[in-house]
């Protein structure tokens, strides 16, 4: 685990005076471009992975490996929303370098501490790369969709029927603290990946998995309906009491994982059930807003957000933009929230000697003295999502997506060795193969990655 101390390099980056200030007009594209350029530069000040002796793709201490995956996802969004390719080469190198020996984002250097949620943040980045038509790697390199499928496959193979009648544990390996905990970010991650793969590939088996995970989360209470229109996502539950007691902390990123996952499924299926679920989670997200401006309700009020939690609004901002792209009825509300939050975030980016270091609190019309990768990432995401309705929604394999897939990715089974299956023409991701790979493993409870 990384020590929670700031490196000298990070401090010097914070103090490096450029003399530029961040001014934002949410209605002016050039203003948005200039603001996000400053913020992206500030985010990349924390990255030294391409320097001699450093690790490609990893950010400086004290930021864990998973947050690097989150940060590269923000840089990918920056490329897409702002149409700025400044960091594309670094992004490609990092996503490929950290894929690991099995090309499933379980690199040996991280596996002693890696959890299911950690793996997911890299998987989400490559899923977005496929959906956004980010330039494909050379043909002899792993491809974005195949990498995303590998993340899904390896996570699904860890589905644990031996405790609580299903669900993913937080941790992959039994020696890590939290192995006994089944939490919403890990299960929500599997749901979210299944939802996005459903839409991208058209493969109904991914939808079956999304339904399985959602139903399990609802069954144990991680997803709860506390009022008819109020859907909440609690943090987790413990297998030691058979998942009967809930940790009722609520976090923006957990809520957003489920909300956006529902939006992806609705957009693909047009099923009114998923439509209503999307809108209910959106309505319930008001718990994370004050005067239409985002805040991290689980920790910000007590001024005790840790380094990880300071990045959560970044992912929620991303999920808001995706939901708006996919569900038209959500747009009026989401655009209002994004505009107000972007203005608050811009006001917070007024600190440090450079004059545009971002803080955590977007409610005070100024800098709160906080700074870090998470704060910078969150401000970048909310401001660039001002353009969420100005850019195309995520592509699919049926409407322009070009990333090649591999439904056997991440498994020990080669696709060519599986029995022939009826795969619909046009489903380039290989609908049906996933059934043989994951369905049989699920029935056998083959938890092959859990030691």
Swiss-Prot record:
Catalytic activity: Random hydrolysis of (1->6)-alpha-D-mannosidic linkages in unbranched (1->6)-mannans
Alphabetized InterPro entries for the sequence: 6-hairpin_glycosidase_sf, Glyco_hydro_76, Mannan-1_6-alpha_mannosidase
Pfam families linked to this entry: Glyco_hydro_76 (PF03663)
Main enzyme class: hydrolase
Residues excised as propeptide: 428-451
Signal peptide as annotated in the record: 1-21
GO cellular component: extracellular region; plasma membrane; side of membrane
Protein name: Mannan endo-1,6-alpha-mannosidase DCW1
Organism: Eremothecium gossypii (strain ATCC 10895 / CBS 109.51 / FGSC 9923 / NRRL Y-1056)
Lineage of source species: Eukaryota, Fungi, Dikarya, Ascomycota, Saccharomycotina
Gene from which this protein is expressed: DCW1
């Amino acid at each position: 685990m990384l020590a929670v101390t700031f490196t000298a390099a990070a401090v010097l980056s914070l103090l490096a005076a450029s003399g530029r200030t961040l001014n934002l007009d949410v209605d002016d594209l050039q203003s948005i471009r200039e603001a996000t350029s400053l913020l992206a530069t500030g985010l990349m000040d924390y990255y030294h992975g391409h320097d001699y002796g450093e690790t490609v793709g990893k950010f400086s201490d004290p930021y864990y490996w998973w947050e690097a995956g989150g940060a590269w996802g923000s840089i990918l969004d920056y490329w897409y929303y702002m149409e700025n390719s400044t960091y594309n080469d670094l992004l490609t190198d990092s996503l490929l370098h950290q894929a690991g020996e099995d090309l499933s984002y379980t690199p040996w250097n991280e596996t002693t501490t890696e959890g299911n949620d950690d793996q997911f943040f890299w998987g989400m980045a490559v899923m977005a790369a496929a959906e956004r038509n980010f330039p494909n790697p050379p043909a002899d390199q792993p491809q974005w969709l195949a990498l995303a499928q590998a993340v899904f496959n390896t996570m699904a193979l860890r589905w644990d029927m031996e405790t609580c009648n299903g669900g993913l544990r937080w941790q992959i390996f039994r020696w890590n603290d939290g192995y006994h905990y089944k939490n919403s970010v890990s299960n929500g991650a599997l749901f979210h990946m299944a939802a996005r793969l459903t839409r991208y590939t058209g493969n109904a088996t991914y939808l079956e998995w999304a339904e399985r995970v959602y139903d399990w989360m609802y069954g144990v209470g991680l997803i709860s309906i506390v009022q008819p229109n109020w859907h909440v996502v609690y943090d987790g539950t413990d297998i030691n009491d058979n998942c009967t007691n809930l940790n009722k902390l609520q976090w923006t990123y957990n809520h957003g994982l489920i909300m956006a996952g529902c939006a992806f499924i609705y957009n693909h299926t047009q099923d009114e059930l998923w439509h209503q679920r999307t809108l209910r989670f959106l309505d319930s997200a008001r718990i994370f807003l004050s005067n239409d401006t985002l805040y991290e309700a689980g920790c910000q009020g007590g001024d005790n957000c840790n380094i990880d939690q300071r990045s959560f609004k970044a992912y929620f901002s991303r999920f808001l933009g995706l939901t708006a792209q996919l569900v038209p009825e959500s747009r009026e509300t989401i655009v209002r929230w994004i505009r107000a939050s972007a203005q608050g975030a811009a006001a917070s980016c007024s600190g440090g000697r450079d004059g545009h270091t971002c803080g955590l609190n977007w409610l005070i019309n100024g800098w709160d003295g906080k700074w870090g990768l998470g704060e910078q990432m969150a401000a970048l995401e909310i401001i660039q999502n001002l353009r969420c309705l100005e850019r195309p929604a995520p592509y699919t394999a049926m409407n322009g997506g070009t990333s090649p897939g591999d439904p056997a990715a991440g498994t020990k089974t080669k696709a060519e060795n599986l029995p022939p299956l009826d795969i619909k023409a046009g489903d380039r991701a290989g609908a049906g193969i996933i059934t043989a790979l994951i369905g049989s493993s699920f029935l056998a409870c083959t938890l092959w990655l859990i030691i």
